[in-house]
């Protein structure tokens, strides 16, 4: 399982479910839009602290960012 792709996919899905843009998450979290875009594409390897802060910005549990779902794209498991 590629954790970077899993986290990116989950982050993008949760962000969309909350109706937030990357710019809105940037304002809530302090992480740049460029960082968030790279994260969603699976190009970042966030620390545990970063996962926690991003989850807070989305209003979800940090566990939701690292848990595979039925919506996880094939190849990330």
Swiss-Prot record:
Could you tell me which CDD domains the record lists for this protein? HTH_XRE
Give the SMART domains listed for this entry.
Answer: HTH_XRE (SM00530)
The HTH cro/C1-type domain, residue ranges: 11-65
Q: What is this protein called?
A: Uncharacterized HTH-type transcriptional regulator y4dJ
Output the SUPFAM superfamilies linked to this UniProt entry.
lambda repressor-like DNA-binding domains
Enumerate the transmembrane spans.
Answer: none
Organism field:
Sinorhizobium fredii (strain NBRC 101917 / NGR234)
Gene Ontology, cellular component aspect: cytosol
Which UniProt key words apply to this protein?
DNA-binding, Plasmid, Transcription, Transcription regulation
């Amino acid at each position: 399982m590629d954790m970077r792709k899993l986290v990116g996919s989950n982050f993008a899905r949760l962000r969309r479910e909350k109706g937030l843009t990357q710019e809105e998450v940037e304002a809530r979290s302090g992480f740049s839009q460029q960082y968030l875009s790279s994260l969603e594409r699976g190009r970042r390897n966030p620390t545990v602290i970063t996962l926690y802060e991003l989850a807070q910005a989305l209003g979800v549990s940090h566990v939701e960012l690292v848990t595979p779902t039925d919506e996880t794209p094939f190849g990330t498991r």
